[in-house]
Amino acid sequence: MDEEARAAGCSPAPPRAPAASCGAAAELCLCSPTGVEGIEQVPGCPCFEDAGAVVVSGEAPEGPGVLCSEDGAELKLAEQGALDVRLGSPAVGIHEQQLLHRGTSGSDEAGAINEISPVEVSPSEASSNLDTAGAIGGSPLMLESLPETSDTRGCEQEVMPGVVVGSSNRDASSEVGVESERGSDADGRNGLGEGELVSSVDGGGAEKSSKVTGVLSEEGVDGMETALEPCVASVGSITQVEEGVDRMETSLDDSEASDGSTTQDFDTDVETESSGSSIEEQDMGYGVHIPHTEQAICEVARGNKSSEVKSSDRMSSVTLPTLILASGAAMLPHPSKVLTGGEDAYFIACDGWFGVADGVGQWSFEGINAGLYARELMDGCKKAVMESQGAPEMRTEEVLAKAADEARSPGSSTVLVAHFDGQVLHACNIGDSGFLVIRNGEIYQKSKPMTYGFNFPLQIEKGDDPFKLVQKYTIDLQEGDAIVTATDGLFDNVYEEEIAAVISKSLEAGLKPSEIAEFLVARAKEVGRSATCRSPFSDAALAVGYLGYSGGKLDDVTVVVSVVRKSEV
């Protein structure tokens, strides 16, 4: 599909001058779910300076692929906690690899909005680029004193697709034994409507097939021209049919879309069986910023598909393994934007849907809340998914288009929306928010930033047609893969190789996705505050002629971490 990119937003302003030097080596502090009453500052930790204390707690769904109940249960708030993870030796040295020219959101750069000529982006330029951003200089990233993993309060859906479902079909002249298989195909992906069965009757003669109200049946005919003899005589024995029950026990932690306001800590927990739901809010009332986190275990019905093996007198099922997606998120606004909630937003919804958005900061010069449009996009995406009960037939760009159509606030934003269907990750992207797929400790796939130039990303603005802007991805995933989805606040400050190393070591240590997201958010903030650390943003600035620029780029940071796991059924 030809993609068009049109200019929206403002021309980039020169990057800011280096700030006062901070220590090159600093301890990185994180939060873990150990219940605390407030925020404890750690001496010597740059991450807790000013109003950006990194205490994140909570668990809620990402994740990409939360299996929701039939009625889309609401969420229930739970307890908060804190995690302390220390960085033994932060990477502050000079790496020797080729510089990566990255596009970044101009949300923090001063300047007025200028008229920009349209720039065409060819499909080849919009393709995935697997080049890395460079190695980490200095001491390697080390994780020390990693906390013990707490029990995940997620839900796991136990699906029994291969169980024989049945009842005996009777008519006036015959009583037959029927073997039926329910394929858990409520969304119609396997060609059957909800409630449809595949039935077979074993007889001793010719077979004929007929389709009756969604039921495919094979009737045994014993040479009779007018009617069947009683089936007890023609079949010989009646196969007992057992009815299988798809049992779903789901626990979702805070699948609410982030509204961008992170001055309070929200923790939700809902246990859903059938159609029950409950909501309980806890306002912790902290006077300082607490990043918003979500933790979720999302199970997608991949194991509902089965292959059939037929013989003369039986039909058995071979069930594929079910994959689940455990996801967690953390968000930290720019220190100067804490009161307004920052300009980032994200959502994690049912059935493997999630996304991030980054409002363009230049709108604030016109008196417009730059984060409001981004939050409306994420809220609209979640609403579209929930109203369609997981949107099994909807594409990611369709969900985004529906959200963009319903947004009412002026503004523009970068945005990424993704969906995991149990086997394939589908994603659409506009701008320099992006994702990394990490497999076996290495970057397997990644999105490519869509920019007009340095620090000038492509954006979607109110009234734009997303179908003309999006870059689409489809990636097969397997057990053990990790997906890191984030705004440019992460990718401008943390090298991709370092992100992959954090993911690998954290998973080995048994950390939950939300704890990994907290670590990455805190690391991005640490580099962003530094005037001396080398960063992907400083590399890109030097590459386009901003000589002498060093340090990171302090910005809003939002991270969603998802891990593909096999269901323990």
Swiss-Prot record:
Known EC number: 3.1.3.16
Pfam families recorded: PP2C_2 (PF13672)
Catalytic activities: O-phospho-L-seryl-[protein] + H2O = L-seryl-[protein] + phosphate; O-phospho-L-threonyl-[protein] + H2O = L-threonyl-[protein] + phosphate
Domain of life: Eukaryota
Chain sites annotated for binding Mn(2+) 2: D358, D488, D555
Cofactor notes: Binds 2 magnesium or manganese ions per subunit.
Name of this protein: Probable protein phosphatase 2C BIPP2C1
PPM-type phosphatase domain boundaries: 329-564
Cofactor(s) named in the record: Mg(2+); Mn(2+)
Gene Ontology MF terms: metal ion binding; protein serine/threonine phosphatase activity
Keyword terms: Hydrolase, Magnesium, Manganese, Metal-binding, Protein phosphatase
Residues annotated as binding Mn(2+) 1: D358, G359
Similarity section: Belongs to the PP2C family.
Coiled coil (residue ranges): none
UniProt-annotated stretches for the region Disordered: 120-214, 251-279
Function: May play a role in responses to biotic and abiotic stresses.
Keyword Mitochondrion: no
